[in-house]
From Swiss-Prot:
It is an enzyme of class 2 (transferase). It is found in: Mitochondrion. This is Serine hydroxymethyltransferase, mitochondrial. The gene is SHM1. Its main location: mitochondrion.
Amino acid sequence: MFIRRLHTSSRRLTCGEALRACQQTGARSANGQLMLSQHVQEFDPEMYDILTKERSRQKRSITLIPSENFTSVAVMNLLGSEMQNKYSEGYPGQRYYGGNQYIDMAESLCQKRALELYGLDPAKWGVNVQSLSGAPANLYAYSAIMEVGDRMMGLDLPHGGHLSHGYQLQNGNKISYISKYFQTMAYRVDPATGLVDYDTLSETSKLFRPKVIVAGTSAYARVLDYKRFREIADACGAYLLSDMAHVSGLVAAGVHPSPFEYSDIVTTTTHKSLRGPRGAMIFYRKGIRKVTKKGTEIMYDLDKRINFSVFPAHQGGPHNHTISALAVALKQAATPEFKNYQTAVVENAKVFGEELSKRGFSLVSGGTDTHLLLIDLSPMGIDGSRLETILERLNIAANKNTIPGDKSALYPSGLRVGTPAMTTRGFGPAEFGRVAAYINEAVKLAIGLKSQEPVDAKDAKTRLAHFKSFCAESEQVTKLANEVADWVAQYPVPGEL
């Protein structure tokens, strides 16, 4: 390091200057300053090797997990920036640390862009951008408007809901701690249609009297009827909290109905279809909530309650590098290019579904209105765990998923796939048709390998372990995996253009 500096100097150093430079370099080395300026490949080759392998995996594999995406170089610039060095407990203009004038600017800009992106009047809506991720954001929102033991309703997990909506098993085992903090009751889809059963929800909510109804999904391919949710919530006196984590990018681009018109609170992650950093936002109404029969105006008080729930009730200092990166992503989401991207995401999903259906796959609800599809594998003689396993071997990342009627999340009957990530990389209808063909081939291979499992292996975990070994040893799987990797590697990831 010192020699390089001597050579790049604009003039020759005197003996005294050289000696002092050596002494200063030694001092910096002793207290670790030189280490702090090293790049990861220089200081930690082991970790850099892992990073390199993950980069290669992303480049040479097909990403179908609908909650994943490839964020932009500009977002990555902020995530690895000096913005992460600052502590800033509190909110803009009300911090518990000094030196936050530029952090305040970044967070305020992020809030402004969030409201503008969704066409929200700052007099009627506010937004908190400090939540670290989606599940915590939901907890913070619930805690702001409920006491421990209050009641809430959310879509059942096997029917397309999310853990953070209060999932518990039919036997009463509380899987999500949300169901320990609050009394939760699930609503479900109609088995005949695969669509939310609003009529049953309407009746049960009048009996259960929840304080919150959650309109949100993680594996539901159809548009939610937010107006109907509002009517149901009003009939039982509940808040309507819409969790648009999966579709926030689609909503921003206007290719999916917006929940804001009908909701009291809207939560979302920021890294799925919105294509930003891994974070979350909580939007909340301000102003008049309702007017009584006597003409008395009942005002919202969500502003203070939600902000207090985030900090100091649940979190300390926010992640300023994430908030700054989110501000960039929100600016990107307001562009015509982003709208074109989201239009393609939805169109690709429809084509993908059609191509899968042509090959005999059954889709829960019969298709999709969004970015994702839920495949029912039960008629095909294979389960989601085995198909996920062999697809991973084939350099295709998808995820096993429960479908209505499933009793096990470890060995479910469904596979969840989506189009956001590969649409980012340039996939269109033709490419997703080819992916459907790969999945079809994977099912055939999986059925053949499953037939080789020992008949005396009664334990499901043991049988799956045998299946994984067969996948690793299969020459057919290896050959197809190389074909997939070589093909998808031709499509750029952000930063390569």
